A protein has these predicted regions:
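A polyanion-binding, active-site-adjacent surface
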Residues: 1-200
Length: 200
């Protein structure tokens, strides 16, 4: 645990000093991510928004409040079950979508986070997260709710909470997607427990 935290903190120190793209000169602060560094589930968003840039934490605005409600309904908490991060670690001006260049520059940091935390499940929030994590052939409207492989891990694309705020009709199918995440999480947990039981 100590080595993992040390490795994650070393990466955080590196990210906090990053000036590799123009967002370094417009951000207030870097939003590295937060949660359990040993989490089985990692939530990957697009980029920090205005509220996140002010508070220095991921998903604290209206979208984040809705995300927390959904996760709590699943029985998940940020501190125990999850680690939350973004494709891009700095707030794009005017809350715009990150450019391809910005995402490509920042992606190695996210991939290193995933390598260190080693989650079993990735929840990909929205079209940008799906595109940058899984590739251009995927579409959020077509592929949400389906398990897809991402870097040897199970990934579940879901609508971004901001989309649910704009279109409440998306809430029901999104809840179905999260229920599938809960089902898979429990399945993986039981598999681990069974292996431990049989080995004793």
């Amino acid at each position: 645990m100590l080595a993992m935290n040390q490795s994650l903190n070393e990466l955080k120190d590196q990210v906090l000093k990053c000036t590799n793209c123009s967002l370094a000169y417009t951000r207030r602060q870097v939003i590295f991510g937060e949660g359990n560094p040993r989490a089985s589930i990692m939530v990957v968003g697009e980029a920090p928004g205005y509220d996140e840039d002010i508070q220095g934490r991921p998903f604290v605005g209206k979208s984040g409040q809705l995300l927390d409600k959904i996760l709590a309904a699943c029985g998940f908490s940020r501190t125990e079950h999850l680690y939350i991060s973004n494709i891009v670690k700095c707030h794009p001006p005017e809350n715009r979508v990150p450019t391809l260049n910005e995402a490509e520059i920042c992606m190695p940091y996210l991939l290193k986070q995933i390598e260190i935390i080693d989650p079993k499940i990735l929840i990909l929030l929205g079209a940008s997260s799906l595109k940058y994590m899984a590739g251009n052939t995927y579409r959020i409207t077509r592929d949400r709710g389906k398990w897809i492989p991402v870097n040897g891990r199970l990934a579940m694309p879901v609508f971004h909470p901001a989309a649910l705020l704009r279109n409440p009709a998306l809430k029901r199918p999104t809840w179905d997607d999260y229920k599938e995440v809960v089902r898979k999480y429990r399945e993986l947990l039981m598999s681990i427990i069974s292996r431990i039981t049989y080995s004793n």
